[in-house]
C-alpha cells in the first residue's frame, strides 16, 4: 500500500487541490493508499474527509491519524507529532503550506531529511 504523508496549513481551504493530489497518488499505486496525517483543521481535515469518502465508495484507502498530544507535551506536541509521522514512513509527502506555516514547514524539512520526496502545493499559489 502506497503511503502518503499530508502536512498543511490549518487555514488551507482549497479542497480541489488536496483531493486531486490524493487521487493522483492513488492512481500511481497498485495496492491502495494510506493517508497519513495529523488530524488538524485545514489540509489534514480535507485529506481525512477524502480518505474516508473514498473508503466508503469501496476504494482501497486507509486514513492513518497521528494526533498531537498537546496536554502531555505542550508546545512541543506538534513537532513531536510531525517526527512520529515521518518515522512511520511514507512514499511521498504532499505539503500545503500557506505563508509561514511553521509546523507544516517543519514537517516538510523532516520528510526531506528522511529521504521522503516532498511536493509543495502551497508555494505554487
Curated annotation (Swiss-Prot):
UniProt-listed Pfam families: YAcAr
Full protein name: Gene 61 protein
Taxonomic source organism: Mycobacterium phage L5 (Mycobacteriophage L5)
Amino acid at each position: 500500500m502506497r503511503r502518503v504523508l499530508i502536512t498543511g496549513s490549518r487555514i488551507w481551504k482549497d479542497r480541489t487541490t488536496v483531493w486531486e493530489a490524493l487521487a493522483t497518488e492513488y492512481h500511481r499505486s497498485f495496492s491502495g493508499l494510506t493517508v497519513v496525517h495529523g488530524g488538524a483543521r485545514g489540509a489534514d481535515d480535507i485529506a481525512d474527509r477524502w480518505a474516508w469518502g473514498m473508503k466508503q465508495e469501496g476504494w482501497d484507502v486507509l486514513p492513518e491519524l497521528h494526533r498531537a498530544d498537546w496536554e502531555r507535551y505542550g508546545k512541543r506536541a506538534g513537532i513531536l507529532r510531525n517526527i512520529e509521522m515521518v518515522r512511520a514512513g511514507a512514499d511521498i509527502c504532499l505539503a500545503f503550506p500557506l505563508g509561514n506555516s511553521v509546523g507544516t514547514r517543519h514537517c516538510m524539512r523532516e520528510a526531506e531529511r528522511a529521504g521522503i520526496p516532498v511536493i509543495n502545493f502551497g508555494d505554487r499559489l
